């Protein structure tokens, strides 16, 4: 079992409940999409799974470990086995792309190697290989602030590939890309995860991409799991219920003279 959540709740300091009674299991090597309306709790769930946020209640097990039962040092070692792809990668603007990719293994290297790599990239070939898979091999020595949003997202994915993470958590990893590039990137991420035996959980607003690229789809609504189904069994009724509020808003915005057309939001 790659990850397991039993009865997980998350309540923020202001009293807002982000997650409620989450029960979820992913086997090693599974590839799963997480969908739902804005504010459903997708990012909160990924942060709990990355052991960045401690749940208010319930049990979390990641890669055979209970993160909040570990010492701080052991928990940091566990995090080094987990790759988190951010919607907006937190990369220093003046940092070179090569350094951004190599940072994926800072938690796995001894301190001297991590410090040395910040001054002089020690594995340029490895970084280039990861970038080349995402058609960014020519950006190796560019500064991060010279890249587009979609390019920065692909750098974030290259970083996780270089990290060789056992568990990949991707939070809206292709939101800044056009549909063709987004599909190409998700296909590559799935192939890489399958080839390495890594578990992949990706949150997506683009429902069509989730259904096309992932064998299993989880719908999250108001902090709760609304459905957990094989992609082929996710029907219109399930999606209508998942996005009910957004559909109602779309209907109200439609002119009275035109029939209301409900579109499942893409991003």
Swiss-Prot record:
It is a peripheral membrane protein. It is found in: Cell inner membrane. Its EC number is 7.3.2.2. Residues 3-247 form the ABC transporter domain. One of its GO terms (molecular function) is ABC-type phosphonate transporter activity. Keywords: ATP-binding, Cell inner membrane, Cell membrane, Membrane, Nucleotide-binding, Phosphonate transport, Translocase, Transport. It is an enzyme of class 7 (translocase). It comes from the Bacteria. This is Phosphonates import ATP-binding protein PhnC 2.
């Amino acid at each position: 079992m790659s990850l397991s959540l039993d009865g997980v709740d998350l309540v923020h300091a202001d009293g807002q409940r982000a997650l409620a009674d989450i029960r979820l299991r992913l086997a090693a090597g599974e590839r799963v999409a997480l969908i739902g309306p804005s504010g459903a709790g997708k990012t909160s769930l990924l942060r709990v799974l990355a052991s960045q946020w401690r749940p208010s209640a319930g049990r979390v097990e990641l890669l055979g470990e209970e993160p909040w039962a570990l010492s701080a040092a052991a928990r940091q070692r566990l995090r080094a086995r987990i790759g988190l792809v951010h919607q907006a990668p937190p990369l220093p603007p003046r940092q070179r792309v090569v350094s951004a990719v190599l940072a994926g293994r800072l938690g796995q290297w001894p301190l001297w190697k991590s410090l040395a790599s910040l001054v002089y990239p020690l594995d340029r070939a490895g970084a280039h290989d990861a970038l080349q898979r995402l058609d960014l091999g020519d950006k190796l020595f560019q500064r991060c602030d010279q890249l587009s949003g979609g390019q920065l997202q692909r750098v974030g994915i290259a970083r996780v590939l270089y990290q060789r993470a056992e568990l990949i958590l991707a939070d809206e990893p292709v939101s800044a890309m056009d549909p063709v590039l987004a599909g190409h990137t998700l296909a590559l991420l799935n192939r890489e995860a399958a080839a390495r035996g890594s578990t992949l959980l990706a949150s997506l607003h683009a429902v069509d991409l989730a259904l096309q690229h992932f064998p299993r789809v989880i719908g999250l609504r108001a902090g709760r799991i609304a459905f957990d189904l094989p992609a082929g069994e996710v029907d219109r009724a399930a999606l209508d219920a998942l996005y009910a509020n957004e559909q109602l808003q779309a209907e109200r915005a439609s002119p009275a003279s035109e029939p209301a057309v409900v579109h499942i939001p893409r991003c």
